[in-house]
Curated annotation (Swiss-Prot):
Belongs to the EF-Ts family. It is found in: Cytoplasm. Keywords: Cytoplasm, Elongation factor, Protein biosynthesis. NCBIfam families: tsf. This is Elongation factor Ts. The lineage of its organism: Bacteria, Bacillati, Bacillota, Tissierellia, Tissierellales. The gene is tsf. The keyword Ribonucleoprotein does not apply. The keyword Isomerase does not apply. It comes from Finegoldia magna (strain ATCC 29328 / DSM 20472 / WAL 2508). Residues 81-84 are annotated as: Involved in Mg(2+) ion dislocation from EF-Tu. Associates with the EF-Tu.GDP complex and induces the exchange of GDP to GTP. It remains bound to the aminoacyl-tRNA.EF-Tu.GTP complex up to the GTP hydrolysis stage on the ribosome. GO terms for cellular component: cytoplasm. GO terms for molecular function: translation elongation factor activity.
Length: 224
C-alpha cells in the first residue's frame, strides 16, 4: 500500500474542497492515486463539503434530550436557511447530537475551543506517563524524552476525542466520528451546518451522591 503523505492530502483537499480526514481515508482506499481518490469523494458526495462549511449559518434549531428526568442536554445546530432547519434529516441529526451530549459528556465542540493551558497540562501528564514507561529500559535521557514526546503526539488525540464533541465516536455508529457525520449531512443537504454550542445538566451534579451511570444507560438505549 502506498504511503499517504501530507502533501497528497493537501493536493486532494485543494482539488475537491473535502475535509482532511475524508481525503486521507479515500487516498488510502485509492492506494495513493489522486484521480481515483477524487472519484471516490464524488461518489461519496464529499467533494466540496468543506467549501460549504465556510458559508454563514445563522438559522437553525435548539434541540433537547432528557433521560429519565435525571440528565438532559440542550444543543444549538445552525443552518444557512430556515428551510433546511425544518428538514427531517436535519432535525434527526440535532436529536442525535443532543443524545450524544448526554451519553458522552463532551466539554467542548471542537479542539479549537480547548484552552491552551488545559492542553499543556494534559501533555505534561502524558509525558510523565511515557517517561515512566521507559524506566528500567536503560535508554539515554535525551532519547527517552524523544520517545515520550512521540507517544504524546498520538495520545493527545485520544484526549481530544474524549472531550471534544466533533472528535467523539458517534454513539450510534462508533466507526465514524460526529465530525464525519456532520460532513456527510453537509454534503447531502448542500448547505453549511454547524454545531454551535451545547449545555448538559445532571441532577445533583457537583454534589455528593450515590454512583448512578446515566450516561451508560443512554448508550445502551441508543444501541437498541
Amino acid at each position: 500500500m502506498a504511503q499517504i503523505t501530507a502533501s497528497m492530502v493537501k493536493e486532494l483537499r485543494e482539488k475537491t474542497g473535502a475535509g482532511m480526514m475524508d481525503c486521507k481515508k479515500v487516498l488510502s482506499e485509492a492506494d495513493g492515486n489522486i484521480e481515483k481518490a477524487v472519484e471516490l469523494l464524488r461518489e461519496k458526495g464529499l467533494a466540496g463539503a468543506e467549501k460549504k462549511a465556510g458559508r454563514l449559518a445563522s438559522e437553525g434549531i435548539v434541540e433537547t434530550y432528557i433521560h429519565g428526568g435525571k440528565i438532559a442536554s440542550l444543543v444549538e445546530i445552525n443552518s444557512e436557511t430556515d428551510f433546511v432547519a425544518k428538514n427531517e434529516e436535519f432535525k434527526n441529526f440535532a436529536k442525535d447530537i443532543a443524545m450524544q451530549v448526554v451519553a458522552s459528556n463532551p466539554k467542548y465542540v471542537s479542539r479549537e475551543e480547548v484552552p491552551a493551558e488545559e492542553v499543556e497540562k494534559e501533555k505534561e501528564v502524558l509525558i510523565h506517563q511515557a517517561l515512566n514507561e521507559n524506566d528500567g529500559k536503560n535508554i539515554p535521557e535525551d532519547k527517552a524524552k524523544m520517545i515520550a514526546e512521540k507517544k504524546v503526539e498520538g495520545r493527545i488525540n485520544k484526549f481530544y476525542s474524549q472531550i471534544c464533541l466533533l472528535e467523539q465516536p458517534f454513539i450510534k455508529d462508533p466507526n465514524k466520528t460526529v465530525e464525519q457525520l456532520l460532513t456527510d449531512l453537509i454534503a447531502k443537504i448542500g448547505e453549511n451546518i454547524k454545531i454551535r454550542r451545547f449545555a448538559r445538566f445532571e441532577v445533583g451534579e457537583g454534589l455528593e451522591k450515590k454512583n448512578e451511570d446515566f450516561a451508560e444507560e443512554v448508550k445502551k438505549q441508543m444501541g437498541q
